[in-house]
A protein has these predicted regions:
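NAD(P)-binding Rossmann-fold cofactor-contacting core
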Residues: 1-19
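Rossmann-like NAD(P)(H) cofactor-binding subdomain of soluble oxidoreductases
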Residues: 14, 24-105
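Helical "substrate-binding/catalytic lid" subdomain
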Residues: 138-261
Length: 264
């Protein structure tokens, strides 16, 4: 149960998450539930699951896709889902595990008014920061803008923080000043213990951030746009891999850049 709500699930891997009753197959999950929240790794996974769902009777079932993937996957199947009787929105989540646990993550819903209002009610136990931003697909567009700004900020910090080391400025001093002034962002201030090496837990991996970066650039490309700043993230990706930090938290890349005095 989650906040008094019975939660059941199904995983493609067959893994049973702790505390959640899981069904053996997707068909049974659909039969036993009228709300399906998708949280999948990439475009291929979402494509596979949506196509599988289209084989079932979806009348009255709400599909809420929280995955960080191209919105075109859902948009291209909208007519088929509608014909099957489904109600559907894209509703990507912005914020790492700590924000989800605290109920402060952002959820950006794209869809018609009825579907979005219904989805917001189902998602309210997860967070109160829920926004209906526009028609189907705009939820992921909003996440692209929001999380791209975070990526650009962190990339800029990893590029500039070696200057502090070279000049003899302590890392903690630089971070404290940044995070208490106009240049501060929660994505850094909340991670100061991780950056300083006092907290080894991983909120989100560098490889996951790199995957999201690929999605964001793909979405820009769909609208005939590009972002040199987002493309510059490739330097941070290469640096994290070079330092063996691909599966570690982005905070550790900031510390590594300081320690080796190497701009990413």
């Amino acid at each position: 149960r989650f906040k008094g709500i019975n939660v059941t699930g199904w995983t493609r891997s067959g893994r049973a998450p702790e505390g959640i009753h899981t069904f053996e197959n997707l068909e049974t999950l659909v039969e036993k539930n009228d709300i399906l929240i998708l949280s999948l790794f990439d475009d291929a996974a979402v494509t596979n699951i949506l196509d599988a769902l289209l084989r079932f009777d979806l009348k009255g079932i709400q599909i809420i896709d929280t995955s960080t993937v191209s919105p075109q996957i859902l948009i291209e199947r909208a007519d088929q889902l509608y014909d099957k009787g489904a109600i559907f929105v894209d509703a990507p989540i912005s914020g790492g595990p700590e924000l989800v646990e605290n109920g402060t993550c952002g959820i950006f819903i794209g869809g018609d008014d009825f579907s979005a209002e219904r989805a917001a009610g189902h998602l309210s136990p997860i967070s109160q920061r829920i926004f209906h931003v526009g028609p189907l697909g705009t939820g992921m567009v909003m996440k692209t803008i929001n999380n791209s700004m975070v990526q650009i900020y962190v990339s800029g910090l990893t590029e500039l923080i070696p200057l502090a080391k070279k000049a003899g400025l302590p890392l903690k001093t630089a971070l404290d000043i940044l995070c208490t002034g106009p240049a501060g962002l929660p994505v850094v201030s909340d991670r100061i213990p991780k950056i300083l090496g006092d907290d080894a837990t991983v909120g989100f991996t560098n490889s996951g951030t790199a995957k999201d970066n690929d999605v964001f650039r793909k979405i820009l490309h769909h609208f005939d746009m590009r972002s040199p700043l987002l493309e510059g993230f490739e330097r941070q990706r290469a640096f994290s891999e070079k330092m063996g930090l691909a599966e570690r938290d982005p905070a550790e890349v900031i510390r590594a850049a300081y320690d080796v005095s190497e701009a990413t």
